[in-house]
């Protein structure tokens, strides 16, 4: 983000000030709650929003239409559709990232383990790794644990029969999100109960700072981490390990399943510096 902001500042001849979210700042509020509050009060010009927040703010008329920007012309249709609310393109992702498992393949080979495809195979891998002395086989933080739950919950929905009909039923309240989510949370609870994930540590850890993450994983003392892969971190974070690393989707009933995220850049409809913010989005979300 620092590089893209610097590029926009240089190209447009302006200065950008941005606020990052940490648990320390808003211990009683989620990131989405903070974004909703600030956008509804026109506190900022530009926002980085999660998908459900984009839909909420877009439907309330708080976000500007970005369809006229140059960077919007080459969007894939699935991306455009996901960020269109009431006929307006109200957000553009800076990048699309895939969440999954980063695996130290050298450790797996030493333990004679194959990469897991199903939840049952994953549990067996964790059992063996723990027996081999890896106290917490899976590194995690408070942000990304949910992605494993989503993989379990929606693997069938998005890879099964009539996706549109199932989504419509959810939106209409004819089926319950809890029915989809429960198996995922139950599986996560199993991982925590068996000691494969340090939940207490993850609860208070920021990204890459949890037990088993960051330096632990890169040093080869933790076999698996939950993380994301995208253009922005191919050469950072876990991009250059000294061991053979495999990136796989989360094990599910349908095999390895990545979870895609399209966090979007949006501009406040009534932002104080609306025109300048639109130009910034055009730069930071460009193909360059």
Predicted regions: what is each one?
Residues 20, 110-111, 238-288:
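Extracytoplasmic/periplasmic substrate-recognition and gating elements
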Residues 52-57, 227-243:
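A ligand-binding cleft/hinge motif common to bilobed small-molecule-binding domains
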Residues 11-25, 43, 112-114, 189-207, ...:
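A local structural motif
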Residues 49-99, 114, 123, 180, ...:
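Hinge/lid segment of periplasmic solute-binding proteins
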Residues 90-94, 99, 123-173, 180, ...:
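Extracytoplasmic/periplasmic solute-binding protein
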Residues 10-77, 106-117, 214-218, 223-224:
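Extracytoplasmic "Venus flytrap"/periplasmic binding protein-like
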Residues 128, 170-205:
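Glycine-centered hinge/linker elements that transmit conformational signals in sensory
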Residues 1-3, 23-24:
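Extracytoplasmic "Venus flytrap"
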């Amino acid at each position: 983000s620092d590089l893209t902001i610097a590029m926009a500042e240089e190209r447009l001849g302006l200065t950008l000030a941005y606020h990052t979210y940490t648990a320390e700042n808003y211990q009683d509020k989620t990131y989405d709650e903070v974004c909703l509050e600030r956008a509804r009060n026109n506190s900022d010009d530009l926002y980085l929003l999660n998908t459900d927040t984009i839909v909420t703010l877009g439907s309330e008329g708080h976000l500007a239409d970005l369809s006229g920007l140059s960077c919007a012309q080459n969007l894939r249709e699935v991306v455009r559709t996901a960020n269109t609310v009431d006929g307006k393109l109200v957000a553009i992702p800076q990048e699309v990232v895939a969440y999954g498992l980063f695996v130290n393949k050298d450790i797996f080979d030493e333990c004679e383990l194959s990469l897991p495809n199903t939840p049952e195979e994953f549990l067996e891998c964790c059992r063996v790794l723990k027996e081999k002395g890896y106290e917490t086989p899976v590194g995690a933080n408070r942000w990304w644990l949910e992605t494993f739950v989503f993989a379990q919950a929606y693997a069938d929905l998005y890879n099964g029969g009539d996706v549109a009909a199932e989504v419509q039923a959810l939106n209409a309240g004819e089926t319950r999100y809890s029915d989809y989510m429960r198996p995922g949370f139950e599986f996560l609870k199993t991982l925590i109960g068996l000691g494969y994930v340090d939940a207490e540590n993850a609860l208070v850890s920021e990204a890459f700072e949890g037990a088993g993450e960051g330096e632990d994983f890169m040093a080869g003392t933790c076999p698996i981490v939950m993380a994301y892969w995208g253009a922005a971190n191919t050469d950072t974070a876990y991009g250059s390990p000294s061991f053979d690393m495999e990136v796989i989707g989360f094990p599910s009933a349908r095999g390895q399943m990545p979870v895609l995220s399209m966090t979007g850049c949006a501009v406040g409809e009534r932002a104080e510096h609306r025109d300048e913010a639109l130009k910034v989005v055009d730069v930071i979300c460009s193909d360059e």
